[in-house]
Amino acid sequence: MSRIGNKVIVLPAGVEITNNDNVVTVKGPKGELTREFSKDIEIRVEGTEVTLHRPNDSKEMKTIHGTTRALLNNMVIGVSEGFKKELEMRGVGYRAQLQGKKLVLAVGKSHPDEVEAPEGITFELPNPTTIVISGISKEAVGQTAAYVRSLRAPEPYKGKGIRYVGEFVRRKEGKTGK
């Protein structure tokens, strides 16, 4: 029994769902998201509740059931509240700037790294060492944040690099001299 798949998705005020042959469109105050789901899972919209039903209890159907429900729930949360990830930069001279929709990072390389904001993603800089990535698609926000972090992932000796706010970086001790 898929526990997540059996949970009912309750639609907040101002959110509409349309299901056209398992191509689901979710509209809300922050925008609109569309995604195609497996034809094996039946998606029923009844007023302000969405339920998902699977044809049988095979292992594959249970996994698709839970995944579909989680993706659909994330779409509903995205168009009503949105998602955001915060990154912090640690290191001497590490800073970020915004040039239009482009994020320019100085992270100890001979050249600045430039990151173009994908469609539906916005960058904010509360201060030069903090980056806030926000949007309505959880997948796009997470992927963009992971890409920015990968430009200079935190290293274990001094802890320099780009990390998620609250991320714990395990520190190592350096070599000891003779």
UniProtKB/Swiss-Prot annotation:
Give the record's GO CC terms.
cytosolic large ribosomal subunit
Task: List UniProt keywords, sorted A-Z.
Answer: Ribonucleoprotein, Ribosomal protein, RNA-binding, rRNA-binding
Query: GO molecular function of the protein, one example?
Result: rRNA binding
Cysteines paired by S-S bonds = none
User: Which top-level group of life is the source organism from?
Assistant: Bacteria
GO process annotations (BP):
cytoplasmic translation
Q: Which InterPro entries match?
A: Ribosomal_uL6-like, Ribosomal_uL6-like_a/b-dom_sf, Ribosomal_uL6_a/b-dom, Ribosomal_uL6_bac-type, Ribosomal_uL6_CS
Q: Which PROSITE patterns match?
A: RIBOSOMAL_L6_1
Pfam families found in the cross-reference section? Ribosomal_L6 (PF00347)
Subunit (UniProt):
Part of the 50S ribosomal subunit.
The record's function comment reads: This protein binds to the 23S rRNA, and is important in its secondary structure. It is located near the subunit interface in the base of the L7/L12 stalk, and near the tRNA binding site of the peptidyltransferase center.
The family classification in the record reads:
Belongs to the universal ribosomal protein uL6 family.
Q: Which PANTHER family match?
A: 60S/50S RIBOSOMAL PROTEIN L6/L9 (PTHR11655), LARGE RIBOSOMAL SUBUNIT PROTEIN UL6M (PTHR11655:SF14)
The family database entries (HAMAP family) matched by this protein are listed as:
Ribosomal_uL6_B
State the protein's name: Large ribosomal subunit protein uL6
Organism of origin is Streptococcus gordonii (strain Challis / ATCC 35105 / BCRC 15272 / CH1 / DL1 / V288)
Report which gene this protein is encoded by: rplF
